[in-house]
């Protein structure tokens, strides 16, 4: 029995995780070359792929603007903040974005593929599942990170 190939397609949804997705996440995590990464499911390749990256100077508002109003996405965001002890910290948030206006098929597809992706992206500190912009307000991140 072989345990290699953890990025093989998920048995339920049939979606794997593209190598580029893992590499881009590592660039965000270790090299700080991205502020955020937005992922989408490419049904033709049966993989979760990178849709967009944000450079380190982009704001949280830029990140939110990159999430579609009517379709599901996954995303990771590198959140920098200062603690009450005045220490600079960084936490990585994983977002499962599933707006209420997205289609049922997309919601099911993204829901069944989420665990596979989050297993592949080692080093995520917090996960947020959101269906509308109020659930991804910057204050939500501040509360979770502190």
From Swiss-Prot:
It is found in: Cytoplasm, Cytoskeleton. The lineage of its organism: Eukaryota, Viridiplantae, Streptophyta, Embryophyta, Tracheophyta. Residues 14-146 form the ADF-H domain. InterPro entries: ADF-H (IPR002108), ADF-H/Gelsolin-like_dom_sf (IPR029006), ADF/Cofilin (IPR017904). GO terms for cellular component: actin cytoskeleton; cytoplasm. The keyword Cytoplasm applies. Phosphorylated. Expressed in vascular tissues of all organs. It comes from Arabidopsis thaliana (Mouse-ear cress). Signal peptide: none annotated. This is Actin-depolymerizing factor 6. Induction: By the root-knot nematode Meloidogyne incognita. The modification Phosphoserine is found at residue 13. Actin-depolymerizing protein. Severs actin filaments (F-actin) and binds to actin monomers. The keyword Transit peptide does not apply. Keywords: Actin-binding, Cytoplasm, Cytoskeleton, Phosphoprotein. Its main location: cytoplasm. GO terms for biological process: actin filament depolymerization. Belongs to the actin-binding proteins ADF family. One of its GO terms (molecular function) is actin binding.
């Amino acid at each position: 029995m072989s345990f290699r190939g953890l990025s093989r397609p998920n048995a339920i949804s049939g979606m794997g995780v593209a190598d580029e997705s893992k590499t881009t996440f590592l660039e965000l995590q270790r090299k700080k070359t991205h502020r955020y990464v937005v992922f989408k499911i490419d049904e033709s390749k049966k993989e979760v792929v990178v849709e967009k990256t944000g450079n380190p100077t982009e704001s949280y508002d830029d990140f939110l603007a990159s999430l579609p109003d009517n379709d599901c996405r996954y995303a990771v965001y590198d959140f920098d903040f200062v603690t009450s002890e005045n220490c600079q910290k960084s936490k990585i948030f994983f977002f499962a974005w599933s707006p209420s206006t997205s289609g049922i098929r997309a919601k099911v597809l993204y829901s069944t593929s989420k665990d596979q992706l989050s297993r592949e992206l080692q080093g995520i500190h917090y996960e947020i599942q959101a269906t509308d912009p109020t659930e991804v307000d910057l204050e939500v991140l501040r509360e979770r990170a502190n």
